[in-house]
From Swiss-Prot:
It is found in: Secreted. The keyword Transmembrane does not apply. It comes from Bubalus bubalis (Domestic water buffalo). GO terms for biological process: B cell activation; immune response; interleukin-4-mediated signaling pathway; negative regulation of inflammatory response; positive regulation of DNA-templated transcription; positive regulation of macroautophagy; regulation of immune response. GO terms for cellular component: extracellular space. Residues 1-24 form the signal peptide. This is Interleukin-4. InterPro entries: 4_helix_cytokine-like_core, IL-4, IL-4/IL-13, IL-4/IL-13_CS.
């Protein structure tokens, strides 16, 4: 028994609509998890929060959001691989950022100033909250 010609468009519509809902929901979950982790990190009183990092948000104006998130990931990896503090949170944050960007993250290193880890995380939290409100 074959599908009727009237049923095929309905099934295609259901497939498209449900896949859109699933992908949108993943965006919400990932962003919420990133924001939760950033809230935990930024309220901690830890000497690692004063570590110097590259000011990745001082990149040129034509830098895309993905490139910025890649730069943040690079800085997070540099911190949690060379210091033993906050590894669990910084590693999880790095993984979640990578899931928003892509598997390959090739970014040209730009000459930037320095900032602290706390400042980087605070600015990232602001960006993620804005992104979450639009998701």
């Amino acid at each position: 028994m074959g599908l009727t010609y009237q049923l095929i468009p309905v099934l295609v519509c259901l497939l498209v609509c449900t896949s859109h809902l699933v992908h949108g929901h993943k965006c919400d979950i990932t962003l919420a998890e990133i924001i939760k982790t950033l809230n935990i990190l930024t309220t901690r009183k830890n000497s690692c929060m004063e570590l110097p990092v590259a000011d990745v948000f001082a990149a040129p104006k034509n830098t895309t959001e993905k490139e910025t998130f890649c730069r943040v990931g690079i800085e997070l990896r540099r911190i949690y691989r060379s210091h033993t503090c906050l590894n669990k949170f910084l590693g999880g944050l790095d993984r979640n950022l990578n899931s928003l960007v892509s598997k390959t993250c090739s970014v040209n290193e730009a000459k930037t100033g320095t900032s602290t880890l706390k400042d980087l995380l605070e600015r990232l939290k602001t960006i993620m909250k804005e992104k979450y409100s639009k998701c």
